[in-house]
């Protein structure tokens, strides 16, 4: 097996050198210290010879034309089609992950094939009548360099760009990527540090800071919470989230509450009852939030 460098994998941005050919990744709040020959937590940023390289750059594993509402975005280019792109890897470890076949695993550079250039993806989106390109399926933060080049190419072609993200990103990376994004749907996993720590292996505050940064850059944003019965379904937690939105964003922001179905490593909660989602929606509307959407109801 050749090294990532020998196979031409792209040098990653957001890195700094450490003694002994170690590197520190500055892409997400984990700021992984990565020894030579190893990958970071996400599995796709690998240290080869003291240089961090992105295995995900140029290697989409999911390409699909979707209705924009599937992201979900309900108030951005309604009725249009978006060209969805996903790679692999994630910087959170959600036990209830609904897309674990792409987000979690070990990735062999020998299995990745030839690099797919941003220009080819954008041209394919145009050929298929898409109005936007969406970075989705797995966490786009882990392929930020690829997403950034695709986004710039998309804008030159007159397309909009969409990000579907957990928001677990450093401020410096967000300040680089977010200006090139026209619309985003961000996950709000559960409005407590305990929820993020115990069920996602992350933390809440960096996510909230990412939301603030995106808002400052003026893109359209919608937010989605996957409701796990017994974990993040209380009206108290919902109110804490709504209070933050009202204070730091705007009551008019579209908020999505979606149904959980047991998946990956978490089966402690039953599927979300539709009645529970309706209760949350009615509560939010009574509080003066007009744009409340429900999803993933089977």
Report residues per predicted region.
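Auxiliary Fe-S-binding modules of radical SAM enzymes
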Residues: 1-36, 230-298
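N-terminal [4Fe-4S]-dependent radical SAM core
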Residues: 1-87, 100-104
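A generic "binding-loop/recognition-motif" signal
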Residues: 38, 90, 192
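Iron-sulfur-cluster electron-transfer modules
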Residues: 77-84, 91, 121-125, 132
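Glycine-rich His-Gly loop
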Residues: 87-89, 137
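The canonical Cys-X-X-Cys-His
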Residues: 94-98
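A short alpha->loop->secondary-structure connector
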Residues: 102-114, 156
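Conserved AdoMet/S-adenosylmethionine-binding subsite of the radical SAM
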Residues: 115-272
């Amino acid at each position: 097996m050749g090294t990532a460098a020998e196979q031409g994998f792209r040098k990653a941005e957001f890195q700094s050198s450490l003694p002994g050919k170690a590197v520190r990744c500055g892409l997400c709040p984990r700021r992984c210290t990565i020894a030579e020959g190893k990958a970071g937590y996400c599995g796709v940023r690998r240290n080869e010879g003291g240089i961090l390289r992105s295995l995900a750059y140029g290697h989409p594993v999911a390409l699909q034309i979707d209705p924009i509402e599937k992201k979900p975005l309900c108030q951005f280019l309604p009725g249009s089609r978006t060209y969805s792109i996903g790679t692999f890897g994630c910087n959170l470890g959600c036990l209830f992950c609904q897309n674990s076949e792409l987000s979690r695993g070990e990735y062999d550079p020998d299995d990745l094939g030839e690099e797919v250039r941003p220009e080819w993806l954008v041209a394919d989106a145009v050929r298929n009548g898409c109005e936007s390109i969406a970075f989705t399926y797995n966490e786009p933060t882990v392929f930020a360099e690829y997403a950034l080049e695709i986004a710039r190419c998309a804008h030159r072609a007159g397309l909009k760009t969409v990000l579907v993200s957990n928001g677990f990103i450093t401020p410096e990376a967000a300040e680089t990527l977010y200006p090139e994004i026209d619309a985003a749907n961000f996950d709000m996993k559960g409005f407590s540090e305990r929820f993020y720590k115990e069920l996602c292996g992350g933390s809440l505050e960096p996510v909230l800071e990412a939301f603030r940064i995106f808002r400052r850059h003026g893109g359209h944003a919608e937010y989605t919470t996957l409701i796990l019965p017994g974990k993040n379904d209380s009206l108290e937690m919902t109110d804490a989230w709504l209070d933050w939105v009202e204070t730091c964003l705007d009551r008019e922001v579209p908020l999505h509450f979606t149904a959980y179905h047991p998946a990956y490593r978490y089966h402690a909660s039953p599927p979300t009852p539709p009645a529970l989602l309706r209760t949350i929606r009615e509560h939010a509307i009574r509080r003066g939030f007009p744009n409340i959407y429900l999803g993933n109801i089977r």
